Amino acid sequence: LNPFEHPRAWRQKIVDNVKLTPKIRFDGKGFICALITSRCPVGCEHCMFFSNMSEGKNSVNTMTESRVTSLMRLVHDSNTGYLLVSGGGEGFLEPDLMYQIVEKTSADVTWLVTAAHWARDKKRAREVIRKMYDAFLRGEHKDHGRKICLRVSLDSQHVQRIALPNKNQLQYIVDLIRIFETEYPNEHSFVLMVHSLEGEEALVNDLCKAVSGEKLARHDPLHDNIKFTESAFTIKLESGYEFEVTFAKLLLSDLAADLRDKETLKKRVELFDKDAFRNARGNPAVNYNVDGTIGTDMLVIYNGRVAGGWQSEMPDVPINLDFDDFQSIMQKTLSDPGVLGTIENGLAYRFNIIQEVCPKAVLRSKAVNVRDYSSPVLLEEDKIKLYYSIRVLQDFIAQSRIKKNELEGWPKEIQLLTGMTRLELQSLYLSARYDIVQQFIESSHRFDGFFQCVKKYARERKPDAIIEFFESNPNISRRTVDEWRLLLKRIVNGWYDLCTLNEQEIKSVEEIEAILDERVLAGKRIFEGLSFQ
């Protein structure tokens, strides 16, 4: 049997039977980016997480109190110095969870990212900040030299959607600044930051004028030596109160980026490569500290999923706050050849191996243009997971990282695969009659029935068959339908090498995607691509 026609089972053999010993040692402060919810009431068109309110609150799209408790334990046990509570969605949709984080965090610096839609009402803004401050005091952070930073996103789209009519469009931001200026002027551990985008300098200048501020070079940069920002400065008010303004690049994010649009694709790849290989030193799973030590760099998602190595995870290994602590997270992360190979050798190593059999996978992982999606997109196909794992094992064997008795203890099938030449593996991979569609048929409930509707539509061009299928299967969630819609969109945009669809069927996919979008989902976007476990 060709293992690449049953890649999930063969990859599982590796996960179950091969346990590696890492060389890398994390001896310094770590970094965690935590997404509290996928939901956001603002709905900016440029949102790199495509956040909206199409789905009601549930345990898949929003953290629970117990998950936040587990997150705080992870922050402590992983020696995390820097905690970024980010989008995803708008964390302050769940203010009690944010106050819980403020009180319980043990990180040296904790940023709370917000669009600040809640600041349109100044009374409400004052109440939210006061509750944050009370939580800050309960946490005794001043006694430990820790900082809490409210980081407000400021750009034209946020302002357009949040500003109240008949008011200065920046009034809600001005109100926040005045609250910090008048009520917390001497709190150097409880601070405000404004975060904007390159190209929005005029808007930030307008804000500076609105608060009668003066722009200064940064002299107490909160981000320096932690995470790279494109540029920054400080605004000083007449009262002497100061806050930092940082800028980042606008990403060309798209969950179904069109690989056929070569001009835009080139820009997207350049943006990704700059961030990955200059800003993150080619290894985003490692947090490099100024004292020369290294720490872990993790991503934690609202449904509890944890990437123990940021942009380096293998999507088929479940790691979750609901059942994993720091020790088990790192054990699962560093014993998996697919993850350890990336963490120890960097992103370029992984890209080069996958390029041997599927250049499209490399392109699409960069073209999505959101770093949190790079591993799930790159390694979406089970065939690629298996190929990469085998090639990493071959390199570990060549480097004498695996003892003879360990190798002999592996299943014979794995020994056979790792003993093949690269050309033999490539030949097996490319000859396998298995693609992303077959993968969905095997792994997604009722997709096989939907796939038959796709084939029927390609022959008859009658939308009713699609509609009737979903009417007769009401238990298929809208989240699942949206995931299938996204798959079709990606097929249209040239993401995959396909063997289960003929040319006529591929041509009909765009029409079927439109039917799902307009007639089944009514334009709602629910599946966000990160909560896949």
Language-model segments: residues:
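N-terminal pre-triad scaffold of radical SAM enzymes
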Residues: 18-50, 81-85, 300, 304
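Conserved glycine-rich "GG(E/T)P / GGGxP" loop and the immediately following alpha-helix
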Residues: 31-37, 48-203
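Secreted/processed peptides and extracellular or luminal domains of membrane proteins
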Residues: 46, 50-53, 318, 325
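Classical nucleotidyltransferase
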Residues: 148-291, 301
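Class I S-adenosyl-L-methionine
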Residues: 165-169, 195, 205-208, 236, ...
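Accessory C-terminal segments flanking Radical SAM cores
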Residues: 227-381, 388-389
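Extended non-globular C-terminal regions
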Residues: 353-531
